[in-house]
């Protein structure tokens, strides 16, 4: 369903390590690099984070049955160098058949090649959901049984590129309006027949006579009447024969250039989130930094000591994490109840914490440092996982996978855990994932041990200052200008905690 290809070395150099080189990012005040961000122009304007999967690049590939659409689509998917590319076949949207139509289908008397045979309304709804960054379910169709597979769907979320292929991919105006690039694969109908016979007999268990009968009665007439005219809707027409390599490569290069522009724009927006007017973000009532008590300061000192061994580091971090979590739990949902004391006295309308209304989502892997403390604080808590990593070439954050508790939107409080926040890019993306799953922003609380002011500023600007952040230690911009605090720009907590340093 998705393809992970090694990144190309030919990248725009001005964007390499924008989000990874935290020293440059912070000391230049989310700096204006290569003229990419004008702080004066952004002053007074509100910024809002738009994740890359909210604006996926959608490619439609149409053509007659057997023209080679699937081969062209597979070539594009394997070459465009985007990990989260989804290939969707319109064959999955064939309408389910009743008993009579199924009997006709097995006799090769049912017309699968007319437009009404495909549920284009459902196809449009699913593609629109992907275009809007929402989770969607793609049905699965079985040509062996001539029906949709019961209770089986392909769940898609977070796609950056969507490739739609099918005989009517370029037919419906609503689908065409969602596409960024439309391709028609042209082939002689005799070639289409030969390919179709090979495919249907080998892959779909059909007999030769039935295939030829269906071709002459339904496939060929509909190809001439309905499919061929969709050629006029295409942005590019390529031949389906073996000599189409040049045409396909030209299209692939065009797609790559468009995707690189899209990636660069994503990075520009992330940088812009940190370029708001220099107001004091650390004094807002939604930012909660652990009070610097003697115990807390001592724990900070021990955790930052290079000579502390792994076992002691884990012990002291768990201790500090428990303090931090206990502080964050002051805000959890409560209910009123009646209890009986050990002395058999009744207490009415007292407050009880609803721990079953609390869940946590760890950002792998630094968020996993909180696992022990979470289990000690709320033993039966449900925990989800998100894996977000930066592209090694561009620094762009990318969602690799998400494992969230069922019905997570019904919880009253969701803790989003991370060991360190430096640029804030991964946390911003993680919050957006939760929002896409129906969680109210007010229910989300970020829990982090170490954070920079730059990262916090980005998070607040991305979500209109509505995210509560509980931090063990926050490093201000002024402190970062002091070389003694340069250690705060290096990720080390998860490596130290898990003994990987």
UniProtKB/Swiss-Prot annotation:
Concerning SUPFAM superfamilies, the annotation shows: P-loop containing nucleoside triphosphate hydrolases (SSF52540), PRTase-like (SSF53271)
Phosphoserine: modified positions: 17, 276
Annotated signal sequence is none
A GO cellular component term found in this entry reads: cytoplasm
What are the recorded GO MF terms, alphabetically?
ATP binding; cytidine kinase activity; uridine kinase activity
Q: Where in the cell is it found?
A: Cytoplasm; Nucleus
Q: Which GO terms describe its biological process?
A: CTP salvage; pyrimidine-containing compound salvage; UMP salvage
Q: What is this protein called?
A: Uridine kinase
> What is the source species?
Saccharomyces cerevisiae (strain ATCC 204508 / S288c)
């Amino acid at each position: 369903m998705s393809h992970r290809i090694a990144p190309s070395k030919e990248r725009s150099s001005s964007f390499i390590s924008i989000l990874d080189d935290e020293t440059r990012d912070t000391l230049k005040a989310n700096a204006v690099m290569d003229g990419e961000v004008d702080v004066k122009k952004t002053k007074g304007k509100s910024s809002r984070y738009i994740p890359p999967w909210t604006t996926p690049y959608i490619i439609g590939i149409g053509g007659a049955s057997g023209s080679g659409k699937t081969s062209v689509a597979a070539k594009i998917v394997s070459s465009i160098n985007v990990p989260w590319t989804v290939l969707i076949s319109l064959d999955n949207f064939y309408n389910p058949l009743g008993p009579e139509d199924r009997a006709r289908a097995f006799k090769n008397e049912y017309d699968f090649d007319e437009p009404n045979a495909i549920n284009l309304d459902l196809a449009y709804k699913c593609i629109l959901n992907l275009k809007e960054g929402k989770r969607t379910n793609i049905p699965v169709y079985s040509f062996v049984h001539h029906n949709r597979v019961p209770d089986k769907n392909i769940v898609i979320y977070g796609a950056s590129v969507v490739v739609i292929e099918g005989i009517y991919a370029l037919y419906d105006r609503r689908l065409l309006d969602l596409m960024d690039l439309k391709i028609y694969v042209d082939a002689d109908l005799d070639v289409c027949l030969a390919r179709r016979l090979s495919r249907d007999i080998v892959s779909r268990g059909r007999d030769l006579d039935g295939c030829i009968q269906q071709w002459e009665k339904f496939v060929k007439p509909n190809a001439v009447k309905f499919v061929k005219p969709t050629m006029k809707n295409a942005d590019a027409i390529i031949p389906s024969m073996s000599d189409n390599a040049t045409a396909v490569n030209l299209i692939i290069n065009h797609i790559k250039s468009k995707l690189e522009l899209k990636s660069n724009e994503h990075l520009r927006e992330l940088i812009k989130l940190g370029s708001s007017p220099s107001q004091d973000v650390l004094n807002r009532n939604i930012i909660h930094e652990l009070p610097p008590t003697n115990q807390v300061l001592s724990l900070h000192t021990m955790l930052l000591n290079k000579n502390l061994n792994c076992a002691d580091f884990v012990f002291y971090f768990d201790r500090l994490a428990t303090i931090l979590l206990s502080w964050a739990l002051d805000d959890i949902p409560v209910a009123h109840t009646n209890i009986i004391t050990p002395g058999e006295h009744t207490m009415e309308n007292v407050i009880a914490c609803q721990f079953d209304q609390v869940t946590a989502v760890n950002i792998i892997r630094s968020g996993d440092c909180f696992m022990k403390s979470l289990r000690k604080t709320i033993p039966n808590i449900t925990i989800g996982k998100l894996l977000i990593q930066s592209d090694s070439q561009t620094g762009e954050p990318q969602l690799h996978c998400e494992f969230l508790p069922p019905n997570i939107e019904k919880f009253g409080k969701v803790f989003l855990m991370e060991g360190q926040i430096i640029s804030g890019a991964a946390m911003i993306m993680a919050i957006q994932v939760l929002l896409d799953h129906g969680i109210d922003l007010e229910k989300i609380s970020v829990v982090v041990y170490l954070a920079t002011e730059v990262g916090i500023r980005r998070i607040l600007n991305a979500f209109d200052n509505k995210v509560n952040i509980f931090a063990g230690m926050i490093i201000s911009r002024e402190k970062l200008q002091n070389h003694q605090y340069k250690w705060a720009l290096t990720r080390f907590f998860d490596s130290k905690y898990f003994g990987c340093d």
